[in-house]
């Protein structure tokens, strides 16, 4: 599954601020679509746009990213994976004097994007003075940013990028919740929990910290101004100061915001999921501009001459000029809560929970489905792909949805089987279908015959969620809380079936806990069991004859003593990469373990990586390029791993980057190797420069010799030796060094 074109971090930020030359953009687009090793990428739901700001281009913010759109509708995203320090954006504002974008987060941290820099202003975030430091809005006022918070107005120096002062509209220097500030040429207005206040301005700064209370407008929640005219906006009423009677009222809709302009006031409002945009003229008559055809929950707006941009928290970004259209920002259209599936061609991600449909991800990017072949999709909770015909399968309650891509045909299948809802489905390599029905048992399809295999005991509903099937035809199923692990085994014709329950007792499983949360099959056939107390590893034969006890891997802890691997961690999910390493999702982030679990290679959390949340629900690994997808309690992100699936036969390999530019200091990857290959790199005369083992089907070189020195400019040859000792030349790589 190829990746989308990417820019380097500095190129990206320059492009993001509208400073990118077209040649750079074309160069980036012409590069291989494979992202660099170790790169993180966000796969967020971008259908909810929350904030807009008009600068040299249009800037906007979804829940976790900011984006820019230029005059040609080229879209660039900036998130935690390429420079931002946080997620969950509270407000944005454009500073036209310094040409920089200010971003405030819900945790009260602040970033400023200026040129190729992202500057963090963490003073509010780090302060211990106030318990509630929530940021509500930002106003740019000359060289200052007025940040309205739950304790007052923080003045930020936009030149020095530091806190200048804190203002309190109640004149007491006591914390006062401030929602928004707005200004005219000579006055500053502050909307607070105690009402509306104003004070005099001179040279964009208050002349004294003496604020006057403005009576009335008790229902106001927003402010807007144009020249000397100030508006106070409530849920049902809009006022033009100093008049205390409304100039506009609505009885049904809720006013979300309003924006003053030279010909009146634009009003965005909604009734449930039906939104509208109105223009209130200077004579206080309204004209309808947009309705629910495009708008559902409009929340913000930006105006650029004859173009109106609207941020909608349900419908995304809408633009109106000579025509009206919705601008697609990509990504899955909903948060992924179903159980996904990935192979070398597609990632399928059911929405699950409340919304019918799913997202697919391929070399063409994200595509969202609420219908297939004209059929409305129900709520889908799990997905798989049949390896024999590449058709897509989904779970839909007690039925299955089968979609044939080549014929664009869809059918709902309700086999005469068990009555429970499907919670997981999968196919063996030879195309045998396995389905797990909650509270009921296993459904299997082989040779077009459906077979039902009921559970040996009565289960409560919502007890069975996950299952893996090995090459022996054994199904491994975590039981409900404190019920251990169940194993199903049968002969080929199902004439004999065996169920076995494994628990913490010796000779009966030796699991680290009876609360089993996850199970995974590794590349050697071992079963890895994740519990609420770490991991156990099973290597079992015929369960009707043999004892099946788990091996509990140990690892040195921070004190140097041996302890059980991930002891006291809740292991929510386990995935196996091409090098048989284990990616483990917990309540405390992601752990990458060596193949045998004897060492921890990486530990990613929201504090040291772009993970939006430390609770990991599912991990999916794309085998061809090694991209690892993490579905968290918030959103989905991915990481370009160093291991891929090995090929069956060695042929010419992919080397990237190649040629290696003088400024490049990252890893050089050799992809398309047979598993566990020995890779040798020689100079043109045949002298050995470096050798290494592949991680699955990919080897990594840092561009240095075995002695640790950077190699000289030149052409280098790549040789590969497989486990049988066969060696062949598979490629060349060009190294160029700077002067």
Question: PLM ranges: what are they?
Answer:
Residues 694-725:
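Short, surface-exposed loop/turn motifs with a glycine/proline- and acidic-biased composition
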Residues 717-739:
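C-terminal tail/sorting-segment detector
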Residues 125, 170, 695-696, 734:
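A generic structural motif
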Residues 690-692:
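Short beta-strand in the C-terminal region of the ABC ATPase nucleotide-binding domain
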Residues 1-37:
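Bacterial Sec-dependent N-terminal signal peptides
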Residues 14, 30-653, 678, 688, ...:
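Carboxylate-rich, polar loop motifs that coordinate divalent cations or form catalytic acidic clusters
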Residues 21, 30, 642-647, 655-660, ...:
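Terminal processing/anchoring signals of secreted or surface-associated proteins
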Residues 25, 647-680, 698-701:
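Glycine-centered coil/turn sites that cap beta-strands in beta-rich domains
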